[in-house]
Amino acid sequence: NYGDGVWGKGYGIIDKGAYKIGVISLLGRVWLEGHLDPFQVADDIIKELKKETEIIIVDFHAEATAEKKAFGYCFDGVVSAVFGTHTHIQTADAQILSGGTGYITDVGMTGPEESVLGVKKEIIIEKFRKGFSGMFETADTPAFLQGCIFTVEKDSGKTVEINPITVR
């Protein structure tokens, strides 16, 4: 949902042979200004993707949990799943909304677990204490993987099961 003149596009279709998956990546606008309305852009993209598939997954990259939740409710029953990204902390609210859309506010991150957003914790602590810091450096601690597995019924496009995962 960047405006015209920016390269790339934030959606596409993955052809798996027996079925197709529509994938959309959108940016929220709360504390991340400068983007087109993700709700309107989603409406437009979904109309196009629905011509080819009922399975549509949305990565909603946003800061505010309320904006993510509102987006999930707005598109409940319209898309298969909405998962939030950006905050790097997996939330404990994975659910299937009443219209059949799988939802989680944030899927978490993959990277060094003993870190702040993947960065050496001392650097981030210094930033908060002093108002500035040195260059960000990736933490050199054991990694972990977080995410969410959505099981989607291919004909209806509805989520039938949702399982957050953490692998250490």
Regions found by a protein language model. Give the residues of each.
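Acidic, metal/ion-coordinating pockets
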Residues: N1-R168
